[in-house]
Structure formats: structure tokens, C-alpha cells
Amino acid sequence: MVGDLSDVRAMEQDFPSTRNESGYQRFRLGDFVFSRDEYFVHIEWRAQGKKLSHTMSADVFLRALMRDVAWNFFYGWVNFDDVFGTRNRYDRVELYAGRYHPVYKEQGLDHSACFDSSFVMQAFRSMLDDWTNVGYDPFAAPAETGLTWQGKKQGHNRAALNRARESCRRMPGLPGDVPLRTDRNRYPINRAFLDVPQDEPVIEAEPGFEHEVHAFNLFAYLSRSDVTWNPSVTSVCKHSLFCPTTEEYILPVKHANDRIEWFLQLSDQIEWRIEDRATGRPRASVVMRAGDVAAMPADIRHQGFSRRRSMLLVWENADPRLPQLYEDGILPPSLAGEFQEPGSVK
Amino acid sequence: MSFTDTKTVFGSLDSYVKGGIEVIDDDRRHYAFSNVFEVASLAKPYEKVVVGKNLRYVIETLRAEGTSDWFTASHDESVIVMDGSVEIDLVKLDDPERIAPAHIEGSIRLEAPPQGRRMGLMKLRRGHQALLPKGAAYRFRSTDGVGVLVLQTIHGPHSVEKWSEICLT
Ligand SMILES: [Fe+2]
């Protein structure tokens, strides 16, 4: 859904002649001003009476913006890069620049501001809509979408931006739940997964139990995913959500957790760069191959690198009380405390 | 642009290559890093080894070998077959509350064969995911040697935690 037009107009009124010489609209959210040109996105803010500006490659920015919108600001922090990002405060969203960069922070040149989530969503959708040129799909792997993000404003790609996130209630394929992916509903097998078996499980349900005796081919479902780095929910156990996704190239954001999240690598390999959440100081590099399971602690930011398209199961605990419990130090940021000396009984 | 590497690499008991952690300024235990194939290769049949834990929620790895006991839960669970071929029998329990009342979470082993109507049979292979609906009794049967299952559930009386044994330290 592209934002309701009344809001777009409201923003245009802030800048009566907002289209720059590259043809792109300028946006203002509080003291943040966003603009783009042929190659770059520029973010400006004020701190200590000074004007600060930060420049990012437009494709990197648009890929990050797409995830932030699709994930509804996700859990915790979505860092577009080392300087700019959003923090989900669940009904409000904080935009920040330099807040989690040690030098900006030290020099007092960081800035952050909170807005209603719906306002930021509206603005970000308008930005995505205006800044995405025809032919560019910020969800696709770079090799699939080419260089159409470059240059002066040219058209739109609303079909690519408006994909709904697939969140099952119980499991895909159940009556009334999200459908399985097939050629017919325009989910062809991705070029990287042509060798993934497409056989569905054999189900022999007794009469009356057809709606409950259910299984599906998860790997085939994932082989038909048309997006990268965009988890969809395939099973639910109270607050426990299995959110598998297909990954290729680089996770467009550095995600910082407000809780522990877990990864189960289903196929191939992803390398995770792990940094301290607040400062960006490097902590570790984690290489995950098929069958590997790892926790991502609640005090880190992480960015994944996937050489070829891979299948990753992201496992989330969606309990809304968690951010506060971690923030208050009631829950430890990792499972290190669970490790016992060998031989001891738990 | 060509991407010639068209082979998708899944793991199996016979063929898995564990990744690892390069520490820069950290402790490996923070990542509770294990591998489901390695865990299953060292486990007893159907031992419910916890490989992921987020408060009371868990991911358990099960070595599917022969036929399992019957289990049930007061909530939905789900299972992914990571290796092998597995059949799942389902029975709608006449009195599920007696075995797994709503306030008890996690998989509960049945002490006797399930009393209730047969719901059906599911035949799963690698990559398939099945719903284990709440109030139903289920059991697994490995039909092609040893398999590996990943179970989405809640920590229960039969969950086995041995982090120091299974994780990189
Ligand atoms: Fe993450």
C-alpha cells in the first residue's frame, strides 16, 4: 500500500517546489530532511546549531527503507548504515542520526526524534514510491534487478513495493490461511533453487480432520520466494514464530535486537558480521552453514552476507514484554549463563 | 551476469559442514552455536535436545530412529524434517485436558496408547514441515534409516538441555 495521498500532499506543502533538478521529491520529518539525486540519498539534521549531512548510495538506502516498511520497523533497531536508522518503540518510531556512532555521539552531533509509527510509515512509503524508478525492485538481489535505481527520476515500480508480507495464522496451505506458492499464483521457482524438490507431503486425513492434518514442503515454499531478506511466518506456537526467508547478497540493514533472536540455517551459507549494538565495535564473525543454529544476543547489531541465495529460518519470540525486560536488565542478553561445567546435571 | 553455482546445499547426517565463530572481542557461548545434524548424530532416538531457547519457547532437535513414543501438547507445535523420511500418526484425544491441561506447556509423553479417533497419517521427507495440532496425540516413525527433526515447541518435562556439550565454546 502506498500512503494515502493526503499525507503526501501535506509533505509537499512543507516544500512548495520540492522536486529537485533530478526530479525527486524532498521529504521532511521533524528536523530530518531527506533528498535523493542520481546516485545518492542525503539526510540532513541540526545539532548544536550546526547543519549536519550524511550521504548514502541510493540503492543501499532504498533496500533498507523497503525492509523497514515491510517489517513494520521490525524488532528493535534497523540501522540503514552506521549513522542513520530507526528504533521501533511499538506505536512510536524513533529516527536517529549518529546516535549509535561513537564519534557523532561524543561530539554531541547526533540527533533523534520520535514520531507516531503511522506517520513515519506514511512518509517512508511516499519516499519509497517517489524514489524507486521503473524496473527497480529493492527486495530483489542486485543481479535480478540491475542498475535502474540510478539516474534521474523515471516512473514508479509500485507492484514491487506493494507486496504483502506473508504471515500465516497457523501454517501456509491450511484452509483460510496464506496460500502455498505455485506457478499459478505467480511464484515461480527462483533461478537459484531450480534443483529443490517440489514434492508435497502425502497426507491421509480421516474424514472430518482435513483442516487439521496438515503439512507442506517448506523448502519448496522458500524456493519460490521472490524477495530477499524478508522473513515470512510459516508456523506459530503462541509467541514463538518461525520466520523463514531467502537471503542473497547483503542484508540491507544492520539489525540490532531488542531481544534475543535465533537463526537456523536451512541451506547454504551466511556470514554474519556482529558488532556492539550501541557503538558498532566489532565483536565477532559468525559463519553459519546448513544445519547450524545460533542465537543473536540482545546487545548486538548484525549484518548477513550470503554468497548465493540461501534459506534461513529466523526464529522470533514476539512477546511484547521482552524489550522492557532486556532494557531493565531483568533478562540477560545471551544464553552464556546456561552453560554448565561438563557432567553437571541441570 | 551469470551465477554458475546452481546447486543448493542442504545438510544431512552423512554430509554436513559446521560453520564457526571468529571471535574479535566476544565469548563464543553468547551465540549458543550448534548444528542439528551433529546434535542428532550424538543423541538417543527421539531425545528432545534443546538447540534454541527463547525464555520458555524452544527449538528441539530429535534423532528420528524407529518409532517414537506418543506425545501431545496443550498448544500447536510444528516439526520440520531436516533429513530422512518420517511418518506421523495423529489421534484426536477424547480427553486432551487430562494429559495436557491448558496451563501445562511443552510436549507431554503419553503413558498409555492414545484414546481417541484416528485423525490421519502424514508422510514427510526432507524439507517438509507439519503441524502438530493442539489436543492431538502424535508419534513419529522413521521410514528410511535415521532422520533428523526440528521441533517448534515450549520447554516441557522431556526437554533435554546440554548446552556445554552441543555448543561451540
Ligand atoms: Fe536480526
Predicted regions and their residues:
Chain B
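His/acidic/aromatic-lined binding-pocket segments of jelly-roll/cupin-type domains
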Residues: 69-71, 76-81, 122, 130
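Short hydrophobic/aromatic-rich beta-strand segments that constitute the beta-sheet cores
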Residues: 88-90, 151
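Short acidic-glycine-tyrosine-enriched beta hairpin
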Residues: 93-136
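Tight coil/turn sites that cap or link beta-strands
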Residues: 62-66, 126-127, 133-135, 145
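Conserved short histidine dyad/triad with adjacent acidic residue
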Residues: 58-75, 92-96
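A short hydrophobic beta-strand segment most commonly corresponding to one strand
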Residues: 144-163
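A short, N-terminal "cap"/entry segment at the start of jelly-roll beta-barrel domains
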Residues: 1-60, 67-69, 166-169
